[in-house]
């Protein structure tokens, strides 16, 4: 096959252009892409480091290793009582929440049995259990809860990823969220005098629930 002079010139010109383009691309420094960063979600210290509930001279806490609830004298630090609940607490994970209602009722989440248990604050004796009419889903719930005035509860549930308010009867009163983040470690509660603050740090969400709905 033979080429005319014009075709040879065009072919050589094409090779020359490709060479220049290749050299330019080889020497060109890669452009750095700016990766947007998100500021940490502002959580109050009381939500990250919650204070153990206290009633009079007694401070209540949980022992995750022994799976018990304890009451200590706030002055001396003496162990007043230790309780295993109705028929022992099943705590398969990190969640073992405890709360004292505005009415002075001590409630503990037996998450493995998917219920709340009420203990006598003075003796640790089991008094009653509570669970919603529609049982908690997942393996172990609720992972966060607050006992409201009048026997109501607000809960945060993993797996089903819900924030709900329940009546004393167990009936659902209000559903605040159905799309919490996947990890329970992003769920936080901060208890103030009249309001409970609930947070999902991963989704940067915040809810406020009054302790007394009628107040």
Where are these regions (language model features)?
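Eukaryotic scaffold repeat domains enriched in small/polar residues
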Residues: 4, 10-215
């Amino acid at each position: 096959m033979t080429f005319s002079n014009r075709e040879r010139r065009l072919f050589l010109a094409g090779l020359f252009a490709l060479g220049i383009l290749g050299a330019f691309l080889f020497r060109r420094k890669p452009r750095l892409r700016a990766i947007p960063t998100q500021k940490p979600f502002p959580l109050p210290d009381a939500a990250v480091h919650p204070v153990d509930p206290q009633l009079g001279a007694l401070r209540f806490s949980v022992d995750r290793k022994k799976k018990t609830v304890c009451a200590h004298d706030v002055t001396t630090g003496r162990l007043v009582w230790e309780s295993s609940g109705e028929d022992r607490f099943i705590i398969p994970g990190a969640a073992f929440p405890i709360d004292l209602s505005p009415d002075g009722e001590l409630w503990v989440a037996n998450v493995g049995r998917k219920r709340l248990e009420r203990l006598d604050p003075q003796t640790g004796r089991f008094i009653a259990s509570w669970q919603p009419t529609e049982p908690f889903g997942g393996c172990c719930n609720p992972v966060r809860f607050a006992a409201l005035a009048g026997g109501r509860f607000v809960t945060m549930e993993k797996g089903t990823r819900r924030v709900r308010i329940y009546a004393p009867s167990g009936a659902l009163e209000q559903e605040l969220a159905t799309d919490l983040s996947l990890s329970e470690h992003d769920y936080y509660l901060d208890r103030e005098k009249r309001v409970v603050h609930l947070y999902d740090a991963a989704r940067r969400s915040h809810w406020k629930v009054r302790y007394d709905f009628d107040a």
